[in-house]
Amino acid sequence: MSKRGRGGSSGAKFRISLGLPVGAVINCADNTGAKNLYIISVKGIKGRLNRLPAAGVGDMVMATVKKGKPXLRKKVHPAVVIRQRKSYRRKDGVFLYFEDNAGVIVNNKGEMKGSAITGPVXKECADLWPXIASNAGSIA
């Protein structure tokens, strides 16, 4: 991996269907005090004219907190998407989707700001982000 790689992620990222464009509001699944996250950009996307950058499971995004503790609001935080409603295909051929879109707030190195995650974490995300996998209750 190059010097300017993905923060604290490890391993190769496979192509999955991107279900969360810029402007999407996702649930915050950690115990930082944030209720939801508003995606303002996606890390590592070069882009095409008039195309909205979109994120999928395991992507790092820049997000703001729309509902939650006042200390967290009106600031830009890095976050990692851990669940998405849009179905995506795994290498073994199974299609998988979750009942909500969710992310967790991290720092630039990929270490979680909170200490617990509510709900399952996608296996693709857990493989990429070991610091998130260690705090996950269940990995699906």
Swiss-Prot record:
The reply on keyword Transmembrane helix is: no
Q: What Gene Ontology biological process does one annotation of this record name?
A: translation
Name the NCBIfam families for this protein.
Answer: PRK08571.1
Q: Where are the transmembrane segments?
A: none
InterPro entries, per database record? Ribosomal_uL14, Ribosomal_uL14_CS, Ribosomal_uL14_sf
Give the UniProt keywords, A-Z.
Cytoplasm, Phosphoprotein, Ribonucleoprotein, Ribosomal protein
Phosphotyrosine PTM positions read Y38
What quaternary arrangement does the UniProt entry report? Component of the large ribosomal subunit.
Q: Where in the cell is it found?
A: Cytoplasm
Q: Which domain of life is it from?
A: Eukaryota
Q: What is its main location?
A: cytoplasm
Q: What is this protein called?
A: Large ribosomal subunit protein uL14
Where Phosphoserine occurs, the residues are: S17
Entry GO terms, CC? cytosolic large ribosomal subunit
Q: Organism source for this protein?
A: Canis lupus familiaris
Q: Which family does it belong to?
A: Belongs to the universal ribosomal protein uL14 family.
| Job description of the protein | Component of the large ribosomal subunit. The ribosome is a large ribonucleoprotein complex responsible for the synthesis of proteins in the cell.
Does the keyword Ribonucleoprotein feature in the UniProt annotation? yes
Question: For this protein, what is any one GO molecular function term?
Answer: structural constituent of ribosome
- Gene symbol here is RPL23
| PANTHER family with a match to the protein in the record | 50S/60S RIBOSOMAL PROTEIN L14/L23, LARGE RIBOSOMAL SUBUNIT PROTEIN UL14
